Amino acid sequence: MAKSKYEYVKQFESHDTLLPQCYIVVRIDGKKFHEFSKYYDFKKPNDERALKLMNACAKNVVLQYRHEMILAYGESDEYSFVLKKDTELYKRRRDKLSTLIVSLFTSNYVALWSKFFPGTNLHPKHLPFFDSRCVIYPNLETIRDYVTWRYVDTHINNLYNTAFWQLIQKCGMNPQEAEKRLSGTVSSEKNEILFKECGINYNNEPEMYKKGSLITNKGEILHINVIDSLDSLFEGY
């Protein structure tokens, strides 16, 4: 193959290879999704269409790399893809893993949009985009704790958001009043506020909202107690 005198510039490229025998998580997050969701009038505190769209995109990513992934877990506008510790996907290059997974997810989001939001076209000035990062975890304990962290975070965020928006929508509070009402409250108190002041039993909220979505490497979308399922989820890995 012919070479030019300018090929020397390739020496300035760097390829960060992730440590071997460590679990890899590629986590994607919606960028400026507060503005995006407001423009497309997402329902608060949860928009079922938007969450199912995220799940469909993540499922396609998992199935594309099912031999390299253990699972994916998502809530709101984020998703975490957990890769096997012995994966050699893209030679474990951080830049490749991060960019290819997030670009595949984003292209699916655009392609599947009309299925979940029929009659609402994406505006060229209001398109979805996501950031992405790769993090490595050295052993089974830390990767289990990572998934647990995201699961617990889902519960904390959803309980707060549910109480916050119900105080606004059902009790007539403005955002500042709702925030003040919830300030300093613990989970049990938020549950009580929802039940006594808003007539909402949090236990009856959809499982997808309360528990997030877990996708197995077979493409199954589950809304389960992740903490109770960790042993089976990571069996053999």
UniProtKB/Swiss-Prot annotation:
Residues that coordinate or bind Mg(2+) 1: 29-30, 77
Pfam families associated with the record: Thg1, Thg1C
Binding-site residues, Mg(2+) 2: 29, 77
Superkingdom classification of source: Eukaryota
Presence of keyword Aminoacyl-tRNA synthetase: no
Statement: the UniProt record of this protein carries the keyword ATP-binding: no
Binding site for GTP: 29-34, 76-77
GO BP term (any one): tRNA modification
Keywords, alphabetical: GTP-binding, Magnesium, Metal-binding, Nucleotide-binding, Nucleotidyltransferase, Transferase, tRNA processing
Cofactor binding remark: Binds 2 magnesium ions per subunit.
Enzymatic reactions: a 5'-end ribonucleotide-tRNA(His) + GTP + ATP + H2O = a 5'-end phospho-guanosine-ribonucleotide-tRNA(His) + AMP + 2 diphosphate + H(+)
EC number assigned by the record: 2.7.7.79
Cofactor(s) the protein needs: Mg(2+)
Molecular function via GO: GTP binding; identical protein binding; magnesium ion binding; tRNA guanylyltransferase activity
Function as written in the Swiss-Prot or TrEMBL entry: Adds a GMP to the 5'-end of tRNA(His) after transcription and RNase P cleavage.
Family, per entry: Belongs to the tRNA(His) guanylyltransferase family.
Name of protein: tRNA(His) guanylyltransferase
Origin species: Candida glabrata (strain ATCC 2001 / BCRC 20586 / JCM 3761 / NBRC 0622 / NRRL Y-65 / CBS 138) (Yeast)
